[in-house]
Amino acid sequence: MGIIKFLKNVGKEMKKVTWPKGKELTRYTITVITTVIFFAIFFALIDSGITQLIRLIVE
């Protein structure tokens, strides 16, 4: 299968995709950003706690 045929098939499949509308896209975007921020803060706190624990053990 050549690259041209592959790209044509990709184009056909992309036409079948149902893309989200404005409000739905905004809701999904806010959900993703909120989730990323939550997990970033969560893992930063966990990392900080483990760092402090290791410092207590080492010293």
UniProtKB/Swiss-Prot annotation:
<dbReference type="GO" id="GO:0008320">
    <property type="term" value="F:protein transmembrane transporter activity"/>
</dbReference>
<comment type="subunit">
    <text>Component of the Sec protein translocase complex. Heterotrimer consisting of SecY, SecE and SecG subunits. The heterotrimers can form oligomers, although 1 heterotrimer is thought to be able to translocate proteins. Interacts with the ribosome. Interacts with SecDF, and other proteins may be involved. Interacts with SecA.</text>
</comment>
<keyword id="KW-0811">Translocation</keyword>
<keyword id="KW-1003">Cell membrane</keyword>
<keyword id="KW-0472">Membrane</keyword>
<keyword id="KW-1133">Transmembrane helix</keyword>
<dbReference type="GO" id="GO:0009306">
    <property type="term" value="P:protein secretion"/>
</dbReference>
<keyword id="KW-0812">Transmembrane</keyword>
<feature type="transmembrane region" description="Helical">
    <location>
        <begin position="30"/>
        <end position="50"/>
    </location>
</feature>
<dbReference type="InterPro" id="IPR038379">
    <property type="entry name" value="SecE_sf"/>
</dbReference>
<dbReference type="InterPro" id="IPR005807">
    <property type="entry name" value="SecE_bac"/>
</dbReference>
<comment type="similarity">
    <text>Belongs to the SecE/SEC61-gamma family.</text>
</comment>
<dbReference type="GO" id="GO:0043952">
    <property type="term" value="P:protein transport by the Sec complex"/>
</dbReference>
<keyword id="KW-0813">Transport</keyword>
<dbReference type="GO" id="GO:0005886">
    <property type="term" value="C:plasma membrane"/>
</dbReference>
<comment type="function">
    <text>Essential subunit of the Sec protein translocation channel SecYEG. Clamps together the 2 halves of SecY. May contact the channel plug during translocation.</text>
</comment>
<dbReference type="GO" id="GO:0006605">
    <property type="term" value="P:protein targeting"/>
</dbReference>
<protein>
    <recommendedName>
        <fullName>Protein translocase subunit SecE</fullName>
    </recommendedName>
</protein>
<dbReference type="GO" id="GO:0065002">
    <property type="term" value="P:intracellular protein transmembrane transport"/>
</dbReference>
<keyword id="KW-0653">Protein transport</keyword>
<dbReference type="Pfam" id="PF00584">
    <property type="entry name" value="SecE"/>
</dbReference>
<dbReference type="InterPro" id="IPR001901">
    <property type="entry name" value="Translocase_SecE/Sec61-g"/>
</dbReference>
